């Protein structure tokens, strides 16, 4: 692989983030009049709940961008062969969740339902963390907050979310798995599973995308032969990771722009320019 081609791929992500970040920040998260978002904020029974959903989704775009910046760092010399896949998986996950909350195909009631489910999922995980701290963090305080959110959900007309044993499993709705959300919003289940294989260090994934065989039939232990591998990442893999990052970031931004009534053209042009920089073999 040539250093020039790698440099252009890395620069494509950096340029994309710089250009789109300026445009996105310029709108100051304020929806235009007559946009879907403006109508939801003025018509929903509790505008604060709509605002919470928008804030959650916008934060997730920030998270996705942070992972994208980290990708650049992991691919800059001395380049890593495993960490970049973790960055892109995090970017894909955050972008998909943002799209799920910014979804332009749902109404305000469904948006708040999803927002409540996302809040419950996070607090439920926080409560489990608290239970491991041996009293440093009181899980009862977190469960109290969950109860308050569930009460709010019921006041807004959402029924309790219980399993067959009458145990609470969500608020608003049961939270779908990230894999299902990635498939629903980006149709990238295959790529997400590949990235997950690398993140979880499965041998089949590492041997294909994180290492290269250098020697075979070598004595590794007494009476044991095997192969030696070295960490390695190909130009094809780098290009895949960069394109995946740019594409999922674009789709999340597009959903936000469409919902808030902003002009998507500068973002689309920045995306095309970034992808065009990448030299495919």
What are these regions (language model features)?
Residues 1-53, 118-281:
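Secondary-shell segments that build the walls of catalytic and ion/ligand-binding clefts
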Residues 9, 17-20, 60, 93, ...:
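Short linear sequence motifs
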Residues 39-103:
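Long, hydrophobic/aromatic-enriched structural stretches that serve as scaffold segments
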Residues 79, 106-107, 210:
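Residue-level detector of alpha-helical recognition elements and their boundaries
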Residues 84-86, 102-114, 258-267:
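Short, glycine/acidic-rich hinge or "gate" loops at secondary-structure transitions
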Residues 85-86, 93, 104-110, 223-234:
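Intrinsic-disorder/low-complexity, polar/charged segments
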Residues 86-93, 108, 113-116, 212-217:
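Amphipathic alpha-helical scaffolding segments
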Residues 95-106, 199-203, 253:
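A generic secondary-structure signal for well-formed alpha-helical elements
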């Amino acid at each position: 692989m040539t250093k020039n081609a790698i440099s252009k791929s890395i620069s494509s992500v950096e340029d994309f983030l710089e250009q789109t970040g300026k445009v996105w920040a310029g709108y100051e998260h304020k929806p235009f009049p007559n946009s879907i978002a403006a109508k939801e904020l003025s018509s929903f029974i509790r505008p604060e709940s709509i605002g919470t959903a928008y804030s959650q989704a916008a934060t997730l775009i920030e998270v996705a961008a942070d992972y994208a910046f980290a990708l650049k760092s992991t691919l800059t010399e001395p380049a890593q062969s495993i960490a970049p896949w973790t960055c892109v998986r995090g970017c894909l996950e955050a972008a998909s969740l943002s799209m799920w909350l910014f979804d332009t195909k749902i109404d305000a009631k469904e948006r708040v339902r999803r927002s409540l489910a996302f809040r419950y999922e996070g607090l439920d995980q926080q409560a489990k963390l608290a239970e491991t701290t041996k009293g440093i963090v009181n899980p009862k305080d977190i469960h109290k907050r969950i109860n308050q959110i569930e009460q709010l959900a019921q006041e807004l007309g959402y029924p309790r979310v219980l399993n067959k044993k009458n145990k609470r499993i969500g608020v608003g709705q049961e939270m779908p798995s990230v894999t299902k959300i990635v498939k629903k919003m980006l149709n990238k289940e295959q790529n997400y599973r590949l990235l997950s294989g690398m993140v979880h260090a499965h041998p089949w994934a590492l041997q294909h995308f994180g290492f290269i065989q250098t020697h075979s039939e070598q004595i590794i232990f007494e009476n044991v032969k095997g192969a030696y591998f070295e960490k390695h990442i190909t130009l094809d893999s780098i290009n895949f990771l960069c394109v995946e990052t740019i594409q999922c970031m674009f789709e999340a931004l597009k959903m936000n722009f469409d919902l808030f009534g902003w002009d998507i053209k500068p973002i689309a042009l920045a995306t095309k320019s970034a992808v065009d920089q990448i030299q495919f073999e």
